């Protein structure tokens, strides 16, 4: 099965937290609970960050979906953030695998 990617954009009402706080949040809240192969967060501007989550398959992403939605709801309230965009789909080419 092909790897599966979930891409999101998030709005931070109070501005982005410092990188070390974002990394700590990922370390404590995302890494232990996520079956994803990898997750990248990056700064878009002072009030937005974007994210790519890489799953081993679409099935793995679907199985994680309910838990992910619950985590998103909690973190949205806790950190005053809102998801403004989400797209997803199967990987069709990966340079490191060529």
Residue ranges: model-predicted function:
Residues 1-50, 54-70, 77-98:
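Short S/T/G/P-rich N-terminal loop/turn motif that feeds into the first structured element of a domain
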